[in-house]
C-alpha cells in the first residue's frame, strides 16, 4: 500500500479521548489544561511519520443530536459527561489538526463514523486504498480488501481473523451480530441475555436479523425464541443504530484531502502558546522545518564560542559591550564551585574559566592574580549605561561579596520567568546541561545557552508587560533579590556552647526514654525503624490499631497512630512521641547548627529561595531557619540559641493576624473589617459567636479553638480536618464552620468565587496582580487540594508581597540614614533585625511605620515589635 493511492481517515475524538486518559495532566504557560491536546498532537505526528500519507483527513463528530436520536431518543443517554478538564480542551482539538495542516471533515447531524464510512466507501470505489485509524469496533463493518482498519492502541492492522476471534463472525456480518448483542456504551438495547457466542450462532444459521424474525419458529431454543419475540422492536432498532450511513451528503473531492507541510510560523506559534517544547525536535526532523523558539535555547546554533585568556581580550569585549549597551553574563557553578564566567554579545559567546573553585562564600579573592578578569567585569556590572542580562543573579552578587550593592542595570531571566508563571513547572535553562559529567562539556553547552540571553530578555520583558506583571518583577522581585543576598551574607549569630549543652540534655533524656521504652516492650530494638517498631507494638505487645501499610508491607507507626494509642492509655505511645520530638530537635538543630557556623564570620548563613513556591513566599535552606519550632518549650529553648552580637540587640517585627486582615480586605467582609477597625480581639469575637458565650464567660481554651477556626478557614480546612485539630466530633466541627460562615458573611462566597475562577483560568491573583497558578485544579484526584490552595494563595501571596515591599522600603531607609541595623531573617510574617543597642530606640518606630504602611488596605495593618538578647526573649 503506497502513499500515492492511500487515504488516511483519522477518528478525531477517538484519538483525543485516548490521548486524555494516556497522558499525565499537563498545563500550558497560562495554566490551562492541555494534556489531551499534547497527546493528540503527538499522535498525529506519529501517524505522519509512520504512514507518510498523500491524502489524509481528521474526522470529528459535530456534537449534539443526530439522526440516530430520531430513531431512538435514548441513544447514548447513559454516557456521563467528559471530565471537566477535557471539556475545556475539546474546542481546541481542531486547532491541533489545522496547525499540522490536516484537512478536517465534519457535518452537522452526523457522527464521525458515518463521515468515515462515506469517504471510505467512495474512495475504495475509485480503486484507491483507505486506512481508517481508530479503535472503534463499529468501524470494523467497513473492512474490505481496499478498506483497512489500523488500531493505534494495538499498533497493528485488524484482520478478519481478529474480528472472527472476538465476535464469532466476519466483518460483513458484524452489524447483524452487534444488533443482537447491543452496545452498553452507546445505550443500544440489543436482545437481553444474548451474548457474542449466541448472536454469532444465530447469524451463522439465519444470515441476518431480519431472517431470524422471519423464521422464528426455526429457533430451536424455546427460551431464545420467546426472548427474541419479546425483543423484536429493540433488535430492529439496534440494527438501524449500529449501521453506518455511507451516503452522507458531502462534497467528495479526494484532491481536497491532499496533505502538504504546515506553515512553519503558524505551527511554531501554536506549539509555543501551549508549551509543547518537547515536540520541537520531532516536528523539525519530521517536517523539515525550523522552529525558532526563544525558550528552546540550549540547541541554538552559536556562530562562535571564544575563550578569553587575558585582560586585553576582555577589554576588547568591554569596549564592544559599552558601544552596544547590552550583553549577557552568567556565572556558571557546578556542585558549589565557580567554573566560569560566560559572556555573550551579539552572535558570540565568551568563556572565562575560573581557576579558584572554592565554594566558600567569603573566601573568594577577587583581587587574586588569577582573577585578572574580576575588575573589568565589575566595571561593566556597575556601569549604569550598560544593561546586563543574567540568569540567577545571586551567585553573581555573592562573587563580588561586599561590592555587590554597586551592581546596577541588571536583569534576571529566572526572576522574570517566575513573575510570569509562579506555580507552573519552572524550566531551569541549565538543568539538562548540568547533568553532564565532563566539565568542558558543561561549559561549552552553557555558552550555547548564554548566547540567547538578550533575545530571551526582549521576548520575556514583552510578555511581562503584556501580562501586566512587569511592575511585580521590577518593583518587588528584582530588588528583593539584592536584599536577600545581603541577609545571607550577614547571617545570624548562634551560641554553639549553649547548643552543645542543650544537645547533651536532650541526649540524656533520650537515653532515659529508650530505657523506659525497652522496659515496657520487654526487648531492645531500633526505635527509629518503623518496621521494627510496628512489629514490637502490634505483634509482640498485641496493641490495638495495628494497620499494615500496603506499600511498605509493614505497620503504620505515624504520629496519628501513636496519638490514638496514647488516648487509650498506652504509656509507651507517649514515650515514643516524646522520643521522636527530642531526637528530631537534636538531629536537626542542636547537633547540626554548630557544624554550620562559618569559620570566618562565626555566624550561620542560610540561603533564601525566591522561586520555589507558587505564591511568591520565600523559603530557606541549609539550614532552614524558617521552621525553627516555637510552640513547644524545647523549640523555644532552641530559639534561645539565636543571639545578638555583642553590643547589639535582636528586634522581632511581626505582623499581627495579617492573613485575616487580608481576607477581610479582599473578600470585603464587613464583620471582620469592623472588628479590626475597632481593634477588637478577633479570636475572642469568633469564640463568642461560635460558642454562644459572652466575653467574660470565655476561657483560654475557647479562644484557642477560635484561633484554630479563624486560621483554618483561610486554608480551606474541612470539617474532618478541623475536628482532628480541635479533638471534637465531625458534627461539632461542621457546626463551627457553619456558624463561622454565618457570622462572617461573604467568606464562603469568596471561597466559591475563587474556586470557580481558578477552575476557569488555571490561576488566581493576589492584591498586587501576581498570578498564582494552580495546575492541579483539573486533576480529579487532587482537585480538593488544589481548591484549598487556590483559596489561600491570594491571601498568602498578598501577605508575602506586603512583607517584601516592607523589606525593600526598610533597606532603603536604613541606607539613607546610614544606620548599622541589619535585617537578618524573614520568617513569613516576621522580620528579625540585629541593631546596635544605641539604635534600638531609633529603628523601632521606623520599622513599625514602614511595615504598617507598605500598602493600603480597608483595615489597619498592625506590627508587634519586641527587642531582646535572643530570639526566645522576643517571642
UniProtKB/Swiss-Prot annotation:
Q: Which Gene3D superfamilies match?
A: 3.30.70.370, 5' to 3' exonuclease, C-terminal subdomain, 5'-nuclease, Ribonuclease H-like superfamily/Ribonuclease H, Taq DNA Polymerase, Chain T, domain 4
Q: In its keyword annotation, does this UniProt entry include Nucleotidyltransferase?
A: yes
GO biological process per UniProt: DNA-templated DNA replication; double-strand break repair
Q: PROSITE patterns annotated for this entry?
A: DNA_POLYMERASE_A (PS00447)
Q: Which residues form the 5'-3' exonuclease domain?
A: 1-283
Reactions catalysed = DNA(n) + a 2'-deoxyribonucleoside 5'-triphosphate = DNA(n+1) + diphosphate
Which GO MF terms are attached to this record?
A: 5'-3' exonuclease activity; DNA binding; DNA-directed DNA polymerase activity
Family stated for the protein in its record: Belongs to the DNA polymerase type-A family.
* Assigned keywords, A-Z: DNA damage, DNA repair, DNA replication, DNA-binding, DNA-directed DNA polymerase, Exonuclease, Hydrolase, Nuclease, Nucleotidyltransferase, Transferase
Relate the assembly described in the record.
Answer: Single-chain monomer with multiple functions.
Is Ubl conjugation among this UniProt entry's keywords?
A: no
- Organism (species): Rickettsia conorii (strain ATCC VR-613 / Malish 7)
What does the record give as EC number? 2.7.7.7
Q: What does this protein do?
A: In addition to polymerase activity, this DNA polymerase exhibits 5'-3' exonuclease activity.
Q: Which SMART domains match?
A: 53EXOc, HhH2, POLAc
Q: Where is the signal peptide?
A: none
Protein name according to UniProt: DNA polymerase I
Q: Name one Pfam family in it.
A: 5_3_exonuc
Amino acid at each position: 500500500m503506497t502513499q500515492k493511492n492511500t487515504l488516511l481517515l483519522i477518528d478525531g475524538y477517538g484519538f483525543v479521548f485516548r490521548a486524555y486518559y494516556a497522558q499525565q495532566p499537563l498545563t500550558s504557560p497560562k495554566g490551562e489544561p492541555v494534556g489531551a491536546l499534547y497527546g493528540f498532537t503527538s499522535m498525529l505526528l506519529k501517524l505522519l511519520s509512520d504512514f507518510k500519507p498523500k491524502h489524509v483527513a481528521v474526522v470529528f463528530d459535530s456534537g449534539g443530536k443526530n439522526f440516530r436520536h430520531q430513531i431512538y431518543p435514548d441513544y447514548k443517554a447513559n454516557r456521563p459527561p467528559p471530565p471537566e478538564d477535557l471539556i475545556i480542551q475539546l474546542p481546541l482539538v481542531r486547532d491541533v489538526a489545522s496547525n499540522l495542516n490536516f484537512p478536517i471533515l465534519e457535518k452537522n447531524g452526523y457522527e464521525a463514523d458515518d463521515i468515515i464510512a462515506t469517504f471510505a466507501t467512495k474512495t475504495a470505489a475509485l480503486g484507491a486504498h483507505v486506512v481508517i485509524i481508530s479503535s472503534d469496533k463499529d468501524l470494523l463493518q467497513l473492512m474490505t480488501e481496499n478498506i483497512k482498519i489500523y488500531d493505534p492502541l494495538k499498533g497493528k492492522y485488524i484482520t478478519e481473523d481478529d474480528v472472527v476471534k472476538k465476535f464469532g463472525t466476519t466483518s460483513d456480518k458484524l452489524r447483524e451480530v452487534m444488533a443482537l448483542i447491543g452496545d452498553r456504551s452507546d445505550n443500544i438495547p440489543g436482545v437481553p441475555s444474548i451474548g457474542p457466542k449466541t448472536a454469532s450462532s444465530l447469524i451463522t444459521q439465519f444470515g441476518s436479523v431480519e431472517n431470524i424474525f422471519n423464521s422464528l419458529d426455526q429457533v430451536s431454543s424455546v427460551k431464545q425464541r420467546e426472548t427474541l419475540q419479546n425483543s423484536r422492536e429493540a433488535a430492529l432498532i439496534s440494527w438501524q443504530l449500529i449501521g453506518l450511513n455511507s451516503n452522507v451528503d458531502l462534497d467528495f473531492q479526494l484532491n481536497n484531502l491532499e496533505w502538504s507541510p504546515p506553515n512553519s510560523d503558524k505551527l511554531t506559534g501554536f506549539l509555543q502558546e501551549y508549551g509543547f517544547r518537547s515536540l520541537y525536535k520531532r516536528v523539525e526532523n519530521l517536517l523539515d522545518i525550523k522552529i525558532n523558539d526563544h525558550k528552546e535555547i540550549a540547541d541554538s546554533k552559536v556562530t562562535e564560542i571564544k575563550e578569553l585568556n587575558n585582560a586585553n581580550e576582555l577589554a576588547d569585549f568591554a569596549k564592544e559591550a559599552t558601544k552596544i549597551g547590552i550583553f549577557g553574563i552568567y556565572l556558571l557553578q557546578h556542585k558549589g564551585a565557580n567554573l566560569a564566567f560566560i559572556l555573550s554579545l551579539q552572535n558570540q559567546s565568551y568563556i572565562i574559566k575560573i581557576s579558584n573553585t572554592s565554594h566558600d562564600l567569603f573566601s573568594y579573592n577577587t583581587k587574586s592574580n588569577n582573577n585578572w578578569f574580576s575588575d573589568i567585569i565589575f566595571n561593566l556590572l556597575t556601569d549604569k549605561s550598560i544593561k546586563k542580562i543574567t540568569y540567577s543573579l545571586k551567585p553573581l552578587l555573592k562573587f563580588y561579596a561586599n561590592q555587590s550593592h554597586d551592581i546596577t542595570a541588571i536583569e534576571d531571566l529566572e526572576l522574570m520567568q517566575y513573575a510570569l508563571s509562579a506555580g507552573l513547572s519552572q524550566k531551569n535553562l541549565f538543568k539538562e546541561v548540568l547533568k553532564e559529567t565532563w566539565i568542558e562539556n558543561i561549559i561549552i553547552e552553557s555558552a550555547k545557552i548564554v548566547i540567547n540571553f538578550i533575545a530571551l530578555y526582549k521576548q520575556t520583558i514583552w510578555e511581562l508587560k503584556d501580562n501586566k506583571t512587569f511592575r511585580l518583577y521590577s518593583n518587588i522581585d528584582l530588588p528583593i533579590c539584592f536584599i536577600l543576598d545581603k541577609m545571607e551574607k550577614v547571617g545570624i549569630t548562634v551560641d554553639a556552647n549553649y547548643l552543645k549543652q542543650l544537645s547533651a540534655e536532650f541526649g540524656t533524656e533520650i537515653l532515659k526514654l529508650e530505657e523506659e521504652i525497652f522496659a515496657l516492650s520487654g526487648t531492645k530494638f531500633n526505635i527509629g525503624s518503623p518496621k521494627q517498631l510496628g512489629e514490637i507494638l502490634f505483634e509482640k505487645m498485641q496493641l490495638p490499631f495495628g494497620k499494615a501499610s500496603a506499600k511498605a508491607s509493614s505497620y503504620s507507626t505515624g504520629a496519628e497512630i501513636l496519638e490514638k494509642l496514647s488516648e487509650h492509655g498506652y504509656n509507651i505511645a507517649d514515650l515514643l512521641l516524646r522520643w521522636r520530638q527530642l531526637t528530631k530537635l537534636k538531629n536537626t538543630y542542636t547537633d547540626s547548627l554548630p557544624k554550620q557556623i562559618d569559620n570566618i564570620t562565626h555566624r550561620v548563613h542560610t540561603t533564601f529561595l525566591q522561586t520555589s513556591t507558587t505564591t511568591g513566599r520565600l523559603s530557606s535552606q541549609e539550614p532552614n531557619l524558617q521552621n525553627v519550632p516555637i510552640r513547644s518549650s524545647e523549640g523555644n529553648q532552641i530559639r534561645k540559641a539565636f543571639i545578638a552580637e555583642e553590643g547589639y540587640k535582636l528586634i522581632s517585627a511581626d505582623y499581627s493576624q495579617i492573613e485575616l486582615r487580608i481576607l477581610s480586605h479582599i473578600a470585603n467582609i464587613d464583620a471582620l473589617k469592623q472588628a479590626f477597625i475597632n481593634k477588637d480581639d478577633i479570636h475572642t469575637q469568633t469564640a463568642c459567636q461560635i460558642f454562644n458565650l459572652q466575653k467574660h464567660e470565655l476561657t483560654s481554651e475557647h479562644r484557642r479553638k477560635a484561633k484554630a477556626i479563624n486560621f483554618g478557614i483561610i486554608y480551606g480546612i474541612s470539617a474532618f480536618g478541623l475536628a482532628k485539630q480541635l479533638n471534637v466530633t465531625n458534627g461539632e466541627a461542621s457546626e463551627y464552620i457553619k456558624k463561622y460562615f454565618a457570622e462572617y458573611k461573604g467568606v464562603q462566597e469568596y471561597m466559591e468565587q475563587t474556586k470557580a475562577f481558578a477552575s476557569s483560568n488555571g490561576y488566581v491573583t493576589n492584591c498586587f496582580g501576581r498570578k498564582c497558578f494552580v495546575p492541579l485544579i483539573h486533576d480529579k484526584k487532587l482537585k480538593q487540594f488544589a481548591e484549598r490552595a487556590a483559596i489561600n494563595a491570594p491571601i498568602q501571596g498578598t501577605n508575602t508581597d506586603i512583607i517584601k515591599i516592607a523589606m525593600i522600603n526598610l533597606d532603603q531607609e536604613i541606607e539613607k540614614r546610614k544606620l548599622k541595623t541589619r535585617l537578618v531573617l524573614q520568617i513569613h510574617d516576621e522580620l528579625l533585625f540585629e541593631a546596635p543597642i544605641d539604635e534600638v530606640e531609633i529603628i523601632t518606630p521606623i520599622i513599625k511605620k514602614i511595615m504598617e504602611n507598605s500598602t493600603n488596605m480597608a483595615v489597619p495593618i498592625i506590627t508587634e515589635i519586641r527587642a531582646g538578647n535572643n530570639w526566645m526573649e522576643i517571642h
